[in-house]
């Protein structure tokens, strides 16, 4: 039987389901509604183990005409999205309810952490200083797994607001009736809206979604979060946080990530940079209008009078008039540039300090005038926002693949008659690059580097030069890091520095190598040691460096366990090398939502990093759909800001213990075995690629307009050419979840069979890293379903070789589950995580029909294509809806 979920959540799920049912009856007819209810009843029976119910369900879908598949698919997809809405709102409701109950545990992890610090005798001075020094940066990326349209997301937010209104205790009957009517209207509107985009979003569209997240939730959540943090600091450290505090900041890859995305050009990057500054100016302009309205008071300091030039009846309004006009001028100038027009920039705000200084003067004046309650109102929120978001709203990272930079340098060396840079030894490359970086003369004549100078190189190379020229024209504060994907050698870093020098970038972007494959992770520390040993480079970095750890590609390359351990070791080695050279290292974690892309609950994920690797500073990507789940609602955004802050503080001040030598030895042994098993299947089995493309919707995923990036790095090729994210997504759709467990279960089982379980038990009890690894494995295994995977296979192929492989994979999945249960001494998965277990049980009756429908839709579509028929719109549309619905139902897998 299904365990009972919290009553308020259950009521919300039921309410949304009932209103969806009423909407279906009204707009799609009683017959469809009856059919959906029949399917739901059969799916519940199948969930509870009734084999006959599942057979009836399968037969029903086989007999349905094409045109009836779409409304059925949409109905079940909508319900899963509504379940997500109800769960997200329940998190916000639970936080609020806890504040009413003095005996309840605080939902803020910082409250518990401060108590822990006190128990562990962390001094208040040390704690205060560490909070002031925090540097957490969350980097928003638009990876193609956010399948929901922005239009629908807005409607989901409106539904959430309706649930909040209905939760109010003192609604009159009429108010409640109106709230229900509004909720039904939103659900009806969602049903009447196409959930699938007609066109792929452009990189500019993606960037605008990032700006919308800031405007709709984080703009208010950030100052509220800092206020709460300050209250805790006052209570525990008896001090106030400084005005310049910004423990969490935000950056973006949207419009800057050109790795494998030909749609991100230098023109697009320039447009996004201008748009970002325009959005910031627009938001600040609204704030300053509100602030001037509030600051009608007369009392002010001598400093304020001097700044105005003479006494004034409304000094603050008068003083802020100039800042308001500058914000208007800034917004106007950016609007003109976005339209391709020139404009006067003499009054444009070009740095954060230009905006901040007038606000700080107002703050000092109010404090001097004995008006702290006004100083600490809207004005303080404004100051917090400027410190967090700057004049750029989101700093833009630039990312490009290392090979492009090598090609660009090669084009230069060949033009100069020096030969092909790419064919040189690594030492020769380093010598040349360092020599040119130290030289005061340019490497090329100036006209070669002009926009019209297309004298050297392939168009791809010219685009690298054009991007560098674009970066040279930006205010330094608008830009973040320059990420080199697929970084392998020290010369990869030096090449980007030389290209920046040649473009005349006065304030070079910090260059961040991204180590992604197993081989590159293993060599990361050696690469950085070589760089730190270079006198010129050591002077250039001025004691600070950032390195990015890739999760997605390493897991696709070696499997989850081997990649995870390689990432851990790389971080340990990088931390040690940086310490040896006196360099302050910031690790940038390229995590996603799925566990094979580094996904894990934030607090667990950060606390399980190697001791010393998080020293008050961290960067983390927030990818695709996770942005909405973590920051789509103000209350949830607040919670995630608290979690990131608590996790970073704890990992810094109370780092986990060093793993014992025997634990390391066992991990090395397990990962060696794991990668062999993984690669034997993925690389060496001749039928594997065909199985992936036949049984999963990998090919169909390419037709879904998910993101601006192509699903493949190259048009042709096998697994190695497939991007890591569609690779994970395809296996998730059929519930095999293969990237997350293949090889891992076999490796653990081998160790248990060798009488090593006692050591594993010790690791599970005492080592946060291993605890997190096993917890994540259990979570993903709980969402896997071998029977559903078998249904796809039996429905989509008659190939005996593929069936043999499928049997092997499902047996490995079964073995992995049994191994995990043995390791944890449990009889069922998620015994210690009832919340997730209940959530999945509620979703099963809606997920099962979507899977069966999807398999049938894939078969019909392929049959039509085999018969050379044109695209079959009802089938294509329904298939895309099924992909979106399953993604919504499974969320972070």
Task: Give, region by region, the residue ranges found by the protein language model.
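Glycine- and acidic
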Residues: 1-5, 58, 196-215, 266, ...
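Hydrophobic alpha-helical packing residues
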Residues: 20, 225, 229, 366, ...
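Catalytic or ion-translocation cores adjacent to nucleophile or general acid/base/metal-coordination motifs
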Residues: 264-293, 501-676
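Often metal-dependent polyanion-binding catalytic scaffolds in large enzymes
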Residues: 1-434, 460, 509, 599, ...
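Short, flexible loop/turn elements at secondary-structure junctions
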Residues: 80, 252-258, 393, 400, ...
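Core mixed alpha/beta domains of very large multi-subunit molecular machines
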Residues: 195, 199, 408, 416-538, ...
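Acidic, glycine-enriched catalytic cores built around paired aspartates
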Residues: 2-5, 14-17, 23-25, 54-78, ...
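Structured alpha-helical segments in the cores of large, soluble enzyme domains
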Residues: 136, 141, 146-149, 153, ...
């Amino acid at each position: 039987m299904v365990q009972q979920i919290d009553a308020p959540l259950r009521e919300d799920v039921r309410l949304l389901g009932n209103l969806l049912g009423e909407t279906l009856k009204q707009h799609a007819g009683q017959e469809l509604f009856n059919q959906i209810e029949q399917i739901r009843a059969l799916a519940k029976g199948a969930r509870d183990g009734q084999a006959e119910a599942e057979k009836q369900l399968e037969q029903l879908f086989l007999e349905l005409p094409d045109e009836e598949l779409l409304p059925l698919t949409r109905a079940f997809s909508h319900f899963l999205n509504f379940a997500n809405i109800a769960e997200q709102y329940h998190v916000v409701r639970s936080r609020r309810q806890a504040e009413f109950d003095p005996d309840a545990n605080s939902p803020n992890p910082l409250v518990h952490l401060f108590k822990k610090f006190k128990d562990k005798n962390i001094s208040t001075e040390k704690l205060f200083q560490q909070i002031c020094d925090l540097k957490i940066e969350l980097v928003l990326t638009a990876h193609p797994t956010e399948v929901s349209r922005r239009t629908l997301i807005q409607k989901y937010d409106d539904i959430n607001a309706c649930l909040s209104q209905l939760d109010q205790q003192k609604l009159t009957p009429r108010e409640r009736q109106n709230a229900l009517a509004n909720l039904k209207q939103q659900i009806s509107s969602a049903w009447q809206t196409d959930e699938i985009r007609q066109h792929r979003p452009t990189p500019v569209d993606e960037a605008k979604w990032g700006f919308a997240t800031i405007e709709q939730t984080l703009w208010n959540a950030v100052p509220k979060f800092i206020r709460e943090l300050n209250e805790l600091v006052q209570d525990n450290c008896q001090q106030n946080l400084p005005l310049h505090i910004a423990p969490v900041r935000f950056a973006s890859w949207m419009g800057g990530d050109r790795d494998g995305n030909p749609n991100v050009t230098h023109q697009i990057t320039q447009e996004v940079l201008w748009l970002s500054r325009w959005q910031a100016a627009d938001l600040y302009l609204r704030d300053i209008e509100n602030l001037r309205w509030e600051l009608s008071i007369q009392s002010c300091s001598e400093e304020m009078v001097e700044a105005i030039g003479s006494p004034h009846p409304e000094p603050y309004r008068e003083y802020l008039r100039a800042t308001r006009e500058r914000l208007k001028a800034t917004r106007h100038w950016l609007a003109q540039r976005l339209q391709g027009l020139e404009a006067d920039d003499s009054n444009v705000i070009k740095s954060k300090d230009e905006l901040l200084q007038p606000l700080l003067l107002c703050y000092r004046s109010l404090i001097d005038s004995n008006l702290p309650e006004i100083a600490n109102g809207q004005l303080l929120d404004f100051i917090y926002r400027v410190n967090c978001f700057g004049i750029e709203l989101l700093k833009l990272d630039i990312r490009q693949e290392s090979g492009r930079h090598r090609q660009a340098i090669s084009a230069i060396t060949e033009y100069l008659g020096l030969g092909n840079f790419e064919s040189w030894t690594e030492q020769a490359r380093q010598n040349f690059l360092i020599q040119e970086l130290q030289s005061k003369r340019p490497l090329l004549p100036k006209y070669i580097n002009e926009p019209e100078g297309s004298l050297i190189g392939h168009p791809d190379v010219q685009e690298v030069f054009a991007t560098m020229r674009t970066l040279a024209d930006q205010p330094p504060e608008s830009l973040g890091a320059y990420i080199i994907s697929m970084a392998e050698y020290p010369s990869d870093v030096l090449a980007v520095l030389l290209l920046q020098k040649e473009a005349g970038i006065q304030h070079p972007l910090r260059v961040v190598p991204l180590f992604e494959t197993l081989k590159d992770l293993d060599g990361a520390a050696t690469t950085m040691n070589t760089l730190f040993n270079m006198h010129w480079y050591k002077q250039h970095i001025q004691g600070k460096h950032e390195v990015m750890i890739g999760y997605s590609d390493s897991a696709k390359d070696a499997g989850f366990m081997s990649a995870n351990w390689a990432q851990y070791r790389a971080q340990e080695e990088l931390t040690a090398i940086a310490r040896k050279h006196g360099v302050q290292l910031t690790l940038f974690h390229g995590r996603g939502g799925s566990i094979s892309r580094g996904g894990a609950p934030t607090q667990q994920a950060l606390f399980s990093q190697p001791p010393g690797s998080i020293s008050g500073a961290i960067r983390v990507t927030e990818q695709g759909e996770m942005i909405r789940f973590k920051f789509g609602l103000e209350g949830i955004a607040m919670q995630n800001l608290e979690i990131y802050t608590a996790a970073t503080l704890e990992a810094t001040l109370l780092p986990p213990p060093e793993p014992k030598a025997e634990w390391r030895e066992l991990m090395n042994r397990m990962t060696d075995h794991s990668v062999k098993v993984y690669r034997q299947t993925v690389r060496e089995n001749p039928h594997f690629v065909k199985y992936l493309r036949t049984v999963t919707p990998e090919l169909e995923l390419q037709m879904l307009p998910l993101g601006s990036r192509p699903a493949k790095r190259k048009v042709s090729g096998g697994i190695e050419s497939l991007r890591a994210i569609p690779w994970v997504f395809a296996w998730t759709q059929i519930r095999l979840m293969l990237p997350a467990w293949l090889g891992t279960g076999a490796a653990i089982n081998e160790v248990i069979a060798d009488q090593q379980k006692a050591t594993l038990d010790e690791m599970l009890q005492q080592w946060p890293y291993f605890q997190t690894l096993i917890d994540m494995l259990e979570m993903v295994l709980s969402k896997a379903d071998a029977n559903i995977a078998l249904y796809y296979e039996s429905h989509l192929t008659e190939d005996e070789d593929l069936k043999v492989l499928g049997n092997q994979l499902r047996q490995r999945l079964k073995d992995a589950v049994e191994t995990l249960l043995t390791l944890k001494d449990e009889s069922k998965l998620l015994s210690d995580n009832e919340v997730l277990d209940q959530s999945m049980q509620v979703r099963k009756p809606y997920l099962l029909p979507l899977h069966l429908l999807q398999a049938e839709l894939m078969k019909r579509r392929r049959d039509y294509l085999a018969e050379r028929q044109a695209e079959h719109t009802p089938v294509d549309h329904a298939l895309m809806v099924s992909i979106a619905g399953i993604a919504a139902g499974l969320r972070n897998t």
